[in-house]
Amino acid sequence: MVELHDLQPHWGATKEKKRVGRGIGSGHGKTAGRGHKGQKSRSGDRKMPPYFEGGQTPLYMRIPKRGFKNPTRKEYTPVNVGVIDKLFEDGMEITPEVLASKGLCDEKDRVKILGDGELTKKFVIKAHAFSKSAKEKIEKAGGKWEIIS
């Protein structure tokens, strides 16, 4: 019966580790199969980042810089009046918190009301910004808009 301690890999299933740099007689002595000189013969070979181009000025430096990031930019989450008309009851006061409760924005987001869609109900809408068409539609429906900071 075969015991665990008797088990061995099948002949040819394993390979001896190549021991390089162990003398001329081994066939892998002196330069250890790496050839003479150059980057590929040195230790640390092939550890260059993918953007390294061998000392040539890399692409990211050859291409000109464009534009800038405005550090004071204010980003708004857009909400259309048509969506407000569908989701809310007539006469409600709409604030960013109310919009967040319906999943239209996050509570911390700045909200901009846009004028896409029809507005048939009367609302008091408080938001951080309004488009011109949204203001007109809110007033036309008999509602009010108010900018909050």
Swiss-Prot record:
Keyword presence, RNA-binding: yes
- Biological process annotations from GO: translation
Q: What is a single cellular component term in the Gene Ontology annotation?
A: cytosolic large ribosomal subunit
Segments forming a coiled coil? none
Here the segments flagged for biased composition (Basic residues) are: 31-40
Instruction: Offer one Pfam family short name for this entry.
Output: Ribosomal_L27A
Name the keywords, alphabetized.
Answer: Ribonucleoprotein, Ribosomal protein, RNA-binding, rRNA-binding
Q: Where is this region: Disordered?
A: 1-64
Q: In its keyword annotation, does this UniProt entry include Ribosomal protein?
A: yes
GO MF terms listed in the record are: rRNA binding; structural constituent of ribosome
**Gene3D superfamilies per record:** 3.100.10.10
Name the family: Belongs to the universal ribosomal protein uL15 family.
* Subunit comment: Part of the 50S ribosomal subunit.
Q: What does this protein do?
A: Binds to the 23S rRNA.
This chain's protein is named: Large ribosomal subunit protein uL15
- Where does this protein come from, organism-wise? Aquifex aeolicus (strain VF5)
